[in-house]
């Protein structure tokens, strides 16, 4: 009691708010007029521009900056690398080159250095091997949470646009 059931459950809640709610048209319908109150120079037509901006699909080097679609490819790269490390078919010395090649193959972009590449996450340094598939599981759970909310309360777009967050 008072604790989350798992890491994936905790992250699913975060992904629900970040991706399903925060990137939704209904949320931006609610938020934009409030943004205009704080920044009157925002034109009415800019709501759509902001909405499109937060939903733009564009490969990035850093997983935490990835859009909803390419985020999954970041997880797949990490899963494949971890699997090969654990199996012993990939050495630590080979990691940077394999990482760069997978980014080139999967995302069409290449890290310029290890900071943008294999060293960008703290999970391995903290001893969390096999951790990254939990991020994918959490995305699936967030989608299930959203579906359950809609079954119970109606379309999320309408609820969010009306500011019904409780």
Where are these regions (language model features)?
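C-terminal, non-catalytic "cap/extension" segments appended to globular domains
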Residues: 75, 79-166
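A conserved active-site cap/scaffold subdomain adjacent to cofactor or substrate pockets
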Residues: 2-90
